[in-house]
Amino acid sequence: MTITKLLLASIDEAYDRRSWHGTNLRGSLRGVTSGQAAWRPADDGHNIWELVVHAAFWKYDIRRRLGGEKGRSFALEGSNFWARPIEGTMAEWKADLLLLQREHDALRRAVEAFPAARWAKKAPGKPFMFEGLARGVAAHDLYHAGQIQLLKRLQN
């Protein structure tokens, strides 16, 4: 198996494919309503909705780094964490879930297109290799999947 295929497998398992580790990011979001997504554990704590948009942003950021893109902006103004919800409607929640899916699909395409010889090269401005960016986005998805699972349990 090539490094690209291994990285894609890790990214997919962390996002929406079955794996030994349990719930992935998409699985943690299955059946979550806009109300559940908006629930906040504390005044200064992030809710599920904010974690979804945050995960979408970092998929976008890593895709940009892999593709060497400059000047393009994320679908939402700002970076890292956005206050959510704005309206709190199911339509708004579904739109942000779709944003996450679109960014995941775009990231997959960027990983597939990335030259295999460059995975071991250092990412510009970063202390780690491109391969670490791809592995990191998978770890990031699983980290937040765990947070989401905990937030759901706290609501019960």
What is each PLM-predicted segment?
Residues A83-K121, G132-V137:
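Acidic/histidine-rich alpha-helical segments that form the ligand environment
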Residues M1-T4, L8-G22, R26-L29, S34-A83, ...:
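Short, contiguous alpha-helical
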